[in-house]
C-alpha cells in the first residue's frame, strides 16, 4: 500500500496584497498588478513585488546615492524609481538635476531636488509616462544596514566571527577578555 505524499510544506509564501491598510498603496498595488499582467514587463512585476514588501525590506535611500547614480554616463535623462523613502544627506554638497519617482520623499530632500531644477513624480504618474519602464533606473536602500543585522552571522566568540554579541553593558568585564585580547589566550 502506498503512502500519501505530505503536502504540508507546499505553500508558496508570497504576498498578494500590501500588509498596510493605506488605501493609496493598495490602489497602486492594483494598478501595477494590472500593468504587470497586461504588459508582461519585468519592470512592472518588480514594482508590484516591492509595493507589497514589508517596510523592513524597503529601506530608506539616501539622496547621495541617487545623485551618484544620476551622474553616471547615460543616466542623466532617466527617471530614478524607488519604492522606499528618499532621505536628505547633509554630506552631499551639490544636488544634480534629478527626475525621481518614489513612494515618499522627506521635506529636506524634496526641497533640494526641486531647488536643483529636478522633479518628483508619483508612481501612478510614472505608470502613465512609462508603462513599460522605459528610460528608468531602479534603486533600493541597503537592507543589511540595520543595527540588528550586526548580530546575525557565526556566533560571537568563534574564530573569524565579527558578529556583535548581545551584552548587558559595554564595560571591561563584558565579553572583552578571552578571544578579544592576545593576552587572554588568543585574539580573533
Curated annotation (Swiss-Prot):
Bias type Basic residues, positions: 161-171, 178-188
Subcellular location: Cytoplasm
GO cellular component: cytosolic large ribosomal subunit
SUPFAM superfamilies: Ribosomal proteins L15p and L18e
Location (main, coarse): cytoplasm
Paired cysteines (S-S): none
GO MF term (any one): structural constituent of ribosome
Pfam families the record matches: Ribosomal_L18
Gene3D superfamilies in the record: 3.100.10.10
UniProt-listed GO biological process terms: translation
PANTHER family the record matches: 60S RIBOSOMAL PROTEIN L18, LARGE RIBOSOMAL SUBUNIT PROTEIN EL18
Family membership noted in the UniProt record: Belongs to the eukaryotic ribosomal protein eL18 family.
Protein name (record): Large ribosomal subunit protein eL18
Designated gene of the protein: rpl-18
Amino acid at each position: 500500500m502506498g503512502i500519501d505524499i505530505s503536502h504540508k510544506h507546499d505553500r508558496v509564501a508570497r504576498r498578494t496584497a500590501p500588509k498596510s491598510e493605506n488605501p493609496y498603496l493598495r490602489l497602486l498595488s492594483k494598478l501595477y498588478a494590472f500593468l504587470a499582467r497586461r504588459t508582461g514587463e519585468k519592470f512592472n512585476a518588480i514594482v508590484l513585488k516591492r509595493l507589497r514588501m514589508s517596510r523592513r525590506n524597503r529601506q530608506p535611500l539616501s539622496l547621495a546615492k541617487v545623485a551618484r547614480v544620476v551622474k553616471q554616463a547615460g543616466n542623466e535623462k532617466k527617471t530614478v524609481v524607488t519604492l522606499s523613502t528618499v532621505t536628505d544627506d547633509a554630506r552631499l554638497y551639490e544636488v544634480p538635476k534629478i527626475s525621481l519617482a518614489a513612494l515618499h520623499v522627506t521635506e529636506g530632500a524634496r526641497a533640494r531636488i526641486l531647488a536643483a531644477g529636478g522633479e518628483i513624480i508619483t508612481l501612478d504618474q510614472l505608470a502613465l509616462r512609462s508603462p513599460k519602464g522605459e528610460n528608468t533606473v531602479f534603486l533600493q536602500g541597503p537592507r543589511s544596514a540595520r543595527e540588528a543585522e550586526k548580530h546575525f552571522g557565526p556566533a560571537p566568540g568563534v574564530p573569524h566571527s565579527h558578529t556583535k554579541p548581545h551584552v548587558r553593558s559595554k564595560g571591561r568585564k563584558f565579553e572583552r577578555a578571552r578571544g578579544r585580547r592576545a593576552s587572554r589566550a588568543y585574539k580573533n
